[in-house]
Amino acid sequence: MFKIVSRYVYTDIFEVIDSADCYQEALRLKHEYELAFMSAYTIEVVEE
């Protein structure tokens, strides 16, 4: 299980915004969120 985690650029608050069963799906979701949020958030994939 992989978590997609966001962090607002100006704070240190992390939030789990989605999850995926495989790494490839997690990367796809990460890319979609990066396109949607632009540079306001840092998006990371974290393995559980």
Regions found by a protein language model. Give the residues of each.
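Short, mixed-charge low-complexity intrinsically disordered segments
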Residues: I13-F14, L27, H31-E48
